[in-house]
Amino acid sequence: MLRKLLLLLMSCIIFLTRRSKAAAAASASKTLVWGPGLETNAVLPARFFFIQTVDTTGTNFTTSPGENTFEVKITSPTEPYARIWIQILDRNDGSFLVRYRMYASYTDLHVEVLLKDKLVGKSPYVLRGAVYHESCDCPEPDGALWEKNMHCPASFSQIESDLSIFQSVDPDRNAHEIIQRFGKSHSLCHYTIKNNQVYIKTHGEHVGFRIFMDAFLLSLTRKVKLPDIEFFVNLGDWPLEKRRASQNPSPVFSWCGSNDTRDIVMPTYDLTESVLETMGRVSLDMMSVQGHTGPVWEKKINKGFWRGRDSRKERLELVKLARANTAMLDAALTNFFFFKHDESLYGPLVKHVSFFDFFKYKYQINVDGTVAAYRLPYLLAGDSVVFKHDSIYYEHFYNELQPWVHYIPFRSDLSDLLEKIQWAKDHDEEAKKIALAGQQFARTHLMGDSVFCYYHKLFQKYAELQVTKPKVRDGMELVEQPKDDLFPCYCARKKVRDEL
């Protein structure tokens, strides 16, 4: 009798297990597919869209269904061999990020998402008309329409704040005053964009970083016609304008801001280049991070983690703190440049660690370098929780971040860091919730489309403040668009304008 009951129980367990597995199977018809990479006019260096796996009951997967669950094909009816590189990144939360880089322009692209040879969602998705690749010089003449196509927000609070201190901007005055104030002791780029052509004159000795700004301006002007505008970009680490709002400050664009300066903040050169070179020269970008988040939360190492160079005293103190508290912190220096290397205090230099391997650890410690640490966007995009200290420095998105929502704050002198790490250990679910909120923030606000939107809105709003006409000044040179002789594109927009 007992044996019969056991056999009956085992049969029930097997039946329920099979039923559970059947219910958990991914559904081709219910799985969701969306994103700007399915839209013709959302032109980016690497286009992207998302897949959310949904099972047959309509429930979203929250863990990976398997790295090779989906297949994506992108074809053009007019070109049998489309030059398009596709990558499917498993985000380990039931969703996938699909990114693709086009090396030529095509007409009527067809995007098929397949699950075991079955079309997923509303596949095939058809991008009607001319679909332009990154190097195609074909700007949308209507800035408002371009913003609509890119789904840009109506405003950015940091832009509103930065420009609020300027009632007007006088390019004629700035052309003399800014050079006189900053041109000799700092490195500046003086830009004029006229008829959507980029002109530049550099000031100062170390102007190599102009390549980042040049490249982005050329990319942006290939996509949308910018208003005529004249402005200065600070190529150094530190923001420059220390005058108060009441002291008639000069408008200087910088990659980093601070509480004691009045610079106009742009997305950092690091984030900007990673957008331009996604699936290109760089391996670390806002998309690649999402596919390399390491072990799931429960299997991550319960320690704080940091690697970097000695560009701030607090970084040295962090390493000393870690050496005295090895159970809580793993922090080490990879290079000495600013301070004397005292191995008895700071330990030996260690080898560089792949950024993706950072996410083997549950707690990511973000400490300023010379200014704000430009790694923060990538740390947020992982699925570890970020610890960020109080700082006078900020990037273009910091005012949208909330402590205890998107990251765990600690004091700049590190005096409460161990206490905060212990809190995270004792409140694991709350720490995980903060990690996921930070990750969602990065996915929503720091992707390539958001970076392009930010720059365009900044230039548009700044141009509206100009009270004299931007000019191509003496000594300026044209920054020419690169030629793509191998795969030149045919711009339908230019043909329409020529016929008007």
Curated annotation (Swiss-Prot):
Q: Which residues are reported to be glycosylated?
A: N60, N259
UniProt main location, coarse:
endoplasmic reticulum
Family per similarity comment: Belongs to the KDELC family.
Show the PANTHER family listed in the entry: KDEL LYS-ASP-GLU-LEU CONTAINING - RELATED, PROTEIN O-GLUCOSYLTRANSFERASE 2
GO annotation, cellular component aspect: endomembrane system; endoplasmic reticulum lumen
Output this protein's name: Protein O-glucosyltransferase 2
Place the motif Prevents secretion from ER on the sequence: 497-500
Q: Which gene encodes it?
A: poglut2
Signal peptide (UniProt feature, chain positions) = 1-22
**Keyword Endoplasmic reticulum among UniProt keywords:** yes
UniProt keyword Zinc-finger present: no
Task: Please describe what this protein does.
Answer: Protein glucosyltransferase that catalyzes the transfer of glucose from UDP-glucose to a serine residue within the consensus sequence peptide C-X-N-T-X-G-S-F-X-C. Can also catalyze the transfer of xylose from UDP-xylose but less efficiently.
